[in-house]
Amino acid sequence: MLYWLTALSDGGDVWNLFRYITFRAGGAFMTALIFGFLFGRPLINVLRRKQGKGQPIRDDGPEGHFSKAGTPTMGGLLIVGALLTSTLLWARWDNPFVWMVLFVTLAYALIGFADDYAKVSKQNTKGVSGKMRLALGVIIAVIAALWASYNHPAELQNQLALPVFKDTLINLGLLYVPFAICVIVGSANAVNLTDGLDGLAIMPAMIAASTLGVIAYAVGRVDFTEYLDVHYVPGTGEILIFTAALFGAGLGFLWYNAPPAAVFMGDTGSLALGGALGAIAVATKHELVLAIVGGLFVVEALSVIIQVLYFKRTGKRVFLMAPIHHHYEKKGWAEPTIVIRFWIISLILAMIGLATLKVR
């Protein structure tokens, strides 16, 4: 919204700053961060008062988690609130990719909110049925995939970009939209599975979003794409503002989610963050790079898939418990140790993913 202040500029005054995506990204970061600090504690107090016993704890989960009983959930409301407010304030409203990513974020947040509400109100860990969540998630992803494809240049529609190879695209034809749907749905659920320890999901999500934001800015500029030999997607640069806001919102939330957590993000936050990452990857045509920068989420999801399939086939388990962060808990690792080491892994993967822009 503040972009329209450029209409007051004569080209050499302070209003001209609002033309620059990087300036507005900085503003979005600070706005979301301040939002988190201002409204975090009041929101936690409201959630604690409304929820009473807080998020239900699984009976078959790690023993150390029983001490977390009574901690309120739905803290994702703080993330989403800061993210939406900041993005709407600093991003251009005429950019279709910004609206697409915002739509996915809010829609998945609503699914997560319904799930969290069902869990808290019934005081069990079931929530909304898995089939219903999946169906709603697919519908959202279909809309987002078609939305992005419609706004991509004709030469990029239905194309899958290969990292490392110079401006190499594979035409998936009619398979592209189903592929994009899988990226968004898979990303949302992978982040959701990762959110099992205090601070575990939020930092890797922030790191992945920041990396994708840099990529979005790069592929949205002709000069950068010519230098890097990557495809040009006009309009994606504005997504940097969204990712900067996400980083600020994430820091604001982490202030209260750091061990021992005063609030959990719940499915409200994890589904929203995962959906946003998938939507950004689809918008920028960097779906495969998401698998690298979000590699931690991929591993967490794969650990569950492997565990379930292997157990059905043999009656035995590969991991002591899935997702894999619970496996390390069962092995005796302290929760902060797991969280910090997974953060480090996420940072390394993000650097590798970012390097794919240059390594051609």
Swiss-Prot record:
Membrane disposition: Multi-pass membrane protein
Keyword tags: Cell cycle, Cell division, Cell inner membrane, Cell membrane, Cell shape, Cell wall biogenesis/degradation, Magnesium, Membrane, Metal-binding, Peptidoglycan synthesis, Transferase, Transmembrane, Transmembrane helix
Main subcellular localisation: membrane
UniProt catalytic activity: UDP-N-acetyl-alpha-D-muramoyl-L-alanyl-gamma-D-glutamyl-meso-2,6-diaminopimeloyl-D-alanyl-D-alanine + di-trans,octa-cis-undecaprenyl phosphate = di-trans,octa-cis-undecaprenyl diphospho-N-acetyl-alpha-D-muramoyl-L-alanyl-D-glutamyl-meso-2,6-diaminopimeloyl-D-alanyl-D-alanine + UMP
Keyword flag Cell wall biogenesis/degradation: yes
Transmembrane segments: 27-47, 71-91, 93-113, 134-154, 168-188, 199-219, 239-259, 262-282, 288-308, 337-357
Gene Ontology MF terms: metal ion binding; phospho-N-acetylmuramoyl-pentapeptide-transferase activity; UDP-N-acetylmuramoyl-L-alanyl-D-glutamyl-meso-2,6-diaminopimelyl-D-alanyl-D-alanine:undecaprenyl-phosphate transferase activity
Root EC class: transferase
EC assignment: 2.7.8.13
GO biological process, alphabetically ordered: cell division; cell wall organization; peptidoglycan biosynthetic process; regulation of cell shape
UniProt-listed PANTHER family: PHOSPHO-N-ACETYLMURAMOYL-PENTAPEPTIDE-TRANSFERASE, PHOSPHO-N-ACETYLMURAMOYL-PENTAPEPTIDE-TRANSFERASE HOMOLOG
Family, per entry: Belongs to the glycosyltransferase 4 family. MraY subfamily.
Name of protein: Phospho-N-acetylmuramoyl-pentapeptide-transferase
Biological classification of the source: Bacteria, Pseudomonadati, Pseudomonadota, Alphaproteobacteria, Rhodobacterales
Underlying gene: mraY
